[in-house]
């Protein structure tokens, strides 16, 4: 698969909730950053998304591959707008936030732009350009989830 096809396959797998296939498409040392306070391993990002998909069965990422750039086309730029309703328990223990009971509240994020780097036929990094009103914290605020404060 070429870089665009790899990224599209990952996006399609995440949207469908096929996280086994998604894991196959990311490298073992893949890093995710930008919409979370600190960089995390892509395995943690996949677990968060699996749990988000379970808690929000109608979750739609509105993924779109925008273009392919970089040396040999290994940088793929995508966009995403998440929308969903939390009708089930949301497990955020992969990032230390525990379980959140169903709120039956909806959320929608503005369009986020992402740079995905492909190396050796797998996703090596996923970097979200931070934007106000997007990311995990923004979703949790819209759901009415109280975030711990750090003193």
Where are these regions (language model features)?
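C-terminal and inter-domain tail/linker signature
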Residues: 1-151
């Amino acid at each position: 698969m070429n870089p665009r096809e790899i990224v599209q396959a990952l996006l399609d797998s995440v949207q469908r909730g096929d996280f086994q296939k998604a894991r196959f498409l990311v490298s073992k040392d893949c890093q995710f950053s930008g919409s979370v306070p600190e960089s995390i391993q892509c395995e943690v990002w996949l677990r968060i998304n699996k749990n988000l998909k379970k808690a929000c069965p109608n979750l739609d990422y509105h993924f779109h591959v925008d273009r392919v750039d970089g040396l040999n086309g290994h940088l793929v730029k995508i966009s995403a707008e998440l929308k969903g309703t939390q009708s089930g328990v949301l497990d955020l223990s992969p990032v230390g936030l525990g379980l959140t009971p169903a709120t039956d509240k909806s959320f929608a994020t503005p369009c986020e732009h992402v740079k995905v780097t492909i190396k050796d036929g797998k996703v090596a990094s996923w970097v979200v350009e931070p934007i106000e009103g997007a990311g995990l914290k923004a979703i949790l605020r819209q759901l009415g989830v109280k975030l711990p404060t750090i003193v």
